[in-house]
């Protein structure tokens, strides 16, 4: 497995002695769905996009780092029909059993429903555990 860090500048002189990145970008990975299941392989990156053509009943993440914090941001676009849904009660992480993603106030996840609507859904993992999910809806 090879990793590549692309930055224009890395500076160690920051006010909190952390590393400052300039010119940072993330690599998109392919996000696919089949028979209502979204498959996300985080080996190659932490962002991806999908246009929904069916209701999603299961989201399967693979290669989520077992230690530390990691995230995945998914651009979700409704197809020309719209009204597609994404369930978060059957999420698997690295081949484990189904878990229900955690959302603010236990409100669940409701996507925008209009044809061609665009939402951003973020998944945050601590030690490859149950994802914390947040969304930004209805970009237009």
Regions found by a protein language model. Give the residues of each.
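Intrinsic low-complexity, repeat-rich intrinsically disordered segments enriched
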Residues: 1-45
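Acidic, glycine/polar-enriched metal-coordinating patches/loops
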Residues: 37, 51-140
């Amino acid at each position: 497995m090879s990793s590549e860090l692309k930055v224009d500048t890395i500076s160690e002189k920051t006010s909190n002695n952390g590393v400052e990145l300039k010119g940072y970008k993330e690599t998109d990975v392919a996000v696919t769905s089949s028979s209502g299941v979204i498959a996300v392989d985080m080996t190659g990156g932490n962002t991806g996009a999908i246009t929904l053509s069916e209701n999603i009943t299961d989201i399967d993440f693979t290669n989520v780092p077992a230690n530390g914090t990691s995230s995945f941001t998914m651009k979700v676009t409704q197809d020309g029909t719209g009204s597609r849904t994404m369930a978060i009660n059957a999420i698997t992480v690295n081949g484990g059993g189904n878990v229900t993603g955690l959302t603010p106030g236990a409100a669940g996840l409701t996507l925008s429903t209009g044809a061609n609507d665009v939402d951003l859904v973020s998944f945050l993992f601590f030690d490859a555990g149950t994802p914390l999910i947040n969304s930004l809806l209805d970009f237009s």
